[in-house]
Amino acid sequence: DLSNVADRRSADFIRRMVYDPQNTLPGTIMPKTPMPDSWRDLVSRYLAERRGAGGEIRDPTPPASRPERPKSGRELYTRFCAPCHGASGRGDGPNAQYLPVRPTVHADSAYMSQRPDDTLFDGIYGGGYILNRSHRMPAFGLTLTREEIWALVRYLRELCRCQGPDWSRNGR
């Protein structure tokens, strides 16, 4: 709930989170969203002015070191995808109930087998709007490495127990 974020966080912290969430709060799942800096400034100012009933303003103490980065596709999925898509890929993560559109069901082999791997990569890298899907699906291209995104694609194939369409796998 960001309705009173200015009561809980300093304007500087809010700005840093909007500009570079991963370095501001190591371990956060909030991705760095591609947008012009002028928009980042507007979002930061808007949030910094959102006051509620009052409260303590505090910034978290950064950890002494960065948390270890998840290595496997499963670990990456658990950290970055499961909050919306669910731990088993059924579109039933804890955040799903708050979204206007149900997250894609990654365990649905009929649906997922129609999606080539490069399309899955593009959706993770660029966000849902790239695929004409929900704009609520954030872009992770500035948060995850290419190798991590490919590890996620491979894990999606494990969840659905399927492969992409033949035409996308036969090298044509």
What are these regions (language model features)?
Residues 49-76, 166-172:
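Electrostatic cytochrome c docking/interface patches
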Residues 96-97, 165:
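Short amphipathic alpha-helical segments
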Residues 1-48, 98-157:
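Extracytoplasmic electron-transfer domains, predominantly the class I c-type cytochrome c fold
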Residues 103, 145-146, 164-172:
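Contiguous, function-dense segments enriched for cysteine-driven chemistry
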Residues 81-84:
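Short cysteine clusters
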Residues 92-94:
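Short Cys/His-rich "knuckle" micro-motifs
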Residues 87-88:
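Cys/His-rich metal-chelating microdomains
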Residues 76-77, 140:
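Conserved short C-terminal alpha-helix that flanks the catalytic cleft of nucleotide-sugar-dependent
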